[in-house]
Amino acid sequence: AASDVYKRQVSGETRGLPVMTGAELAGWRQWLGLTTAQLAAQLGIRDEKRLREWFRGWNQRGRVITIPDGVAQEVAELVAEQEQDAADLAAEALAGDKVIRVPRESDPLRDGMPAEWWMAAAVRARRQHPELRIDWARPATPLD
């Protein structure tokens, strides 16, 4: 779970690296299917420039900066949350018509998460259950 990931990160297995490197943060952002702005919103960070600085590892003045341990913990919790969402999507589809239905990007947030989050979770669910299919939750409209 998230706490296990976090414990491994701070247990010394990182060989002198910070709890989470900028490259790891960027990778988790991509893994979660979120844009930089969306991840900033999930973390309660007002200015997404802060995230970009963490990705790089230095700020605008050229000073080395590290990702705060609390942010690393929050990201680990988001990863665990998405893993649970993927399991829930799979269970729902397996109990029904074997189709995982995902929102379109223009749809409103679902359970506080954007469509990109749900697509990433659906792909993970399908990877675990190849018999499932993924389709849109609603038909396309000219505005999509």
What residues fall within each predicted segment?
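Short glycine-/small-residue-rich flexible loop motifs, especially phosphate/cofactor-binding loops
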Residues: 26, 37, 126
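Recognition helix of helix-turn-helix/homeodomain-like DNA-binding domains
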Residues: 44-67
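DNA major-groove recognition helix of helix-turn-helix
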Residues: 54-55, 71, 75, 79
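Short, small-residue-biased leader/transition segments that mark boundaries at the very start
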Residues: 1-6
